């Protein structure tokens, strides 16, 4: 059984969020939560909320045992970018991109399903 949780339009660049995603991919759920709790990165706090939601979904909707859950998939996709302008000298302007991303976390129990 695989259960997912998503956070869309997170106000962080996908490149920065992927650094944290690579750390938790494949870990046990409890170990991943502990790693994210003590990380100093902004993406870690966002990823922890999504992981907690996925764990709660697995427990409530599927009746899964929390101790057997592991992080099977973590995807960070680019979202739309908001454009802002930064005033420069001599009447010019530069563009600033406020990037967003979509974070998807899937947790699964260690059992393999047979169809």
UniProtKB/Swiss-Prot annotation:
Part of the 50S ribosomal subunit. GO terms for biological process: translation. GO terms for molecular function: rRNA binding; structural constituent of ribosome. The lineage of its organism: Bacteria, Pseudomonadati, Pseudomonadota, Gammaproteobacteria, Legionellales. The keyword Ribosomal protein applies. This protein binds specifically to 23S rRNA; its binding is stimulated by other ribosomal proteins, e.g. L4, L17, and L20. It is important during the early stages of 50S assembly. It makes multiple contacts with different domains of the 23S rRNA in the assembled 50S subunit and ribosome. The globular domain of the protein is located near the polypeptide exit tunnel on the outside of the subunit, while an extended beta-hairpin is found that lines the wall of the exit tunnel in the center of the 70S ribosome. Keywords: Ribonucleoprotein, Ribosomal protein, RNA-binding, rRNA-binding. One of its GO terms (cellular component) is cytosolic large ribosomal subunit. It comes from Coxiella burnetii (strain RSA 493 / Nine Mile phase I). Belongs to the universal ribosomal protein uL22 family. NCBIfam families: rplV_bact. SUPFAM superfamilies: Ribosomal protein L22. This is Large ribosomal subunit protein uL22.
């Amino acid at each position: 059984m695989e259960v997912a949780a998503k956070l869309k339009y997170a106000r962080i660049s996908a490149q920065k969020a992927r650094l944290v995603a690579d750390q938790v991919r494949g870990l046990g759920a409890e170990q991943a939560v502990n790693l994210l709790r003590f990380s100093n990165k902004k993406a870690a706090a966002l990823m922890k909320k999504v992981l907690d939601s996925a764990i709660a979904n697995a427990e409530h909707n599927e009746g899964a045992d929390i101790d057997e859950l592991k992080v099977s998939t973590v995807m960070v996709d680019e979202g739309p970018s908001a454009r802002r302008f930064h005033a420069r000298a001599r009447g010019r302007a530069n563009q600033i991109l406020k990037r967003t991303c979509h974070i998807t976390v899937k947790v699964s129990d260690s059992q393999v399903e047979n169809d």
